[in-house]
């Protein structure tokens, strides 16, 4: 038998596999766009239309950039596009942006800080929307400890600046990083076959 599931939902299922003690969690998958899922009371929350956790569709206000959702504003894909537009060079990818930033490239540092700030805003929205035990970040970029640290620092900066934020989200990398959707697909299959 074959069972299908949304890839971001599979990431959430993989976190249930790795951390069965977690009751409430959000998983945010960052790549060319942003995907996500919610775990509520230890179960995947799909919502009425199957859109539960589709955080990338959260509306943002960035009229100067003509971007209207979090996926367009805060993804790795947008970070790379920003560097391409500002530099006029097309041979960029996320890994190169981080390498050049570490070597002192001011444009790449700016692009990363911009992405981190935009991610932090969305992560704080998620924190105050569902109050999860943890928010796990996935996608290939989650393997980069500098990325995780940068996002945490951006969240901390918002929390320190605005006294209304009394709780900061617990942020971590997805346990299985870029392979999380594969492990989650296995969990989905086992659940559908009543073996989990």
Describe each region flagged by the PLM.
Residues 15-24, 60-196:
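ATP-binding/phosphotransfer module of carbohydrate and carboxylate kinases, centering on a glycine-rich
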């Amino acid at each position: 038998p074959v069972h299908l599931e949304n890839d971001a939902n599979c990431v959430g299922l993989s976190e249930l596999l790795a951390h069965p003690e977690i009751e409430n969690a959000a998983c945010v998958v960052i790549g060319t766009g942003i995907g996500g899922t919610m775990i509520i009371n230890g179960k995947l929350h799909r919502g009425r239309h199957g859109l539960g956790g589709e955080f990338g569709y959260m509306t943002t206000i960035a009229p100067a950039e003509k971007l209207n959702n979090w996926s367009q504003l805060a993804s790795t894909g947008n970070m790379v596009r920003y560097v391409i537009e500002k530099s006029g060079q097309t041979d960029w990818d996320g890994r190169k942006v981080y390498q050049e930033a570490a070597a002192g490239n001011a444009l790449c540092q700016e692009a990363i800080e911009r992405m981190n700030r935009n991610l932090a805003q969305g992560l704080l929205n998620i924190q105050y929307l569902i109050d999860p035990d943890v928010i796990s970040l996935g996608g290939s970029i989650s393997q980069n400890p500098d990325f995780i640290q940068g996002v945490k620092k951006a969240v901390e900066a918002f929390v320190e600046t605005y006294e209304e934020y009394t709780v900061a989200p617990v942020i971590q990398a997805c346990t299985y990083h870029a392979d999380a959707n594969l492990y989650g697909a296995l969990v989905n299959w086992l659940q559908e076959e009543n073996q989990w």
